[in-house]
Amino acid sequence: MSQEKNIDDWRIRIDEIDRELVRLFNERTQCAIEIGHIKKRLGLEIYSPTRERQVIANVTSLNKGPLDAEAVKRLFERVIDEARRIERVHSEAAAQVVTDIQAEIENTFINE
């Protein structure tokens, strides 16, 4: 029974860490969304390979194990891919809002 309790304790700890990871992933994603808005205003591309390489280099240099550098790289490549996708979605949604507002303004003036 004590070994089962030990496993349960570790699983509880993993669940706590998972909750924190989800919170941090969402916080990171919100930052990416804000960056996407800024890029849109400045006319910059969403995809920034130089920055993505910097992020990968940063996180792999921080790694002390037991994950190896390749595992950390793969994890963050996925995180970055998802952030880029969300940036793009939000950027397109913002562009659609602007288009809708412009159309509404034009319709208002045409109908007056």
Residue ranges and their predicted role:
Residues 1-112:
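Domain-level signature for soluble enzymes in the chorismate/prephenate branch of the shikimate pathway
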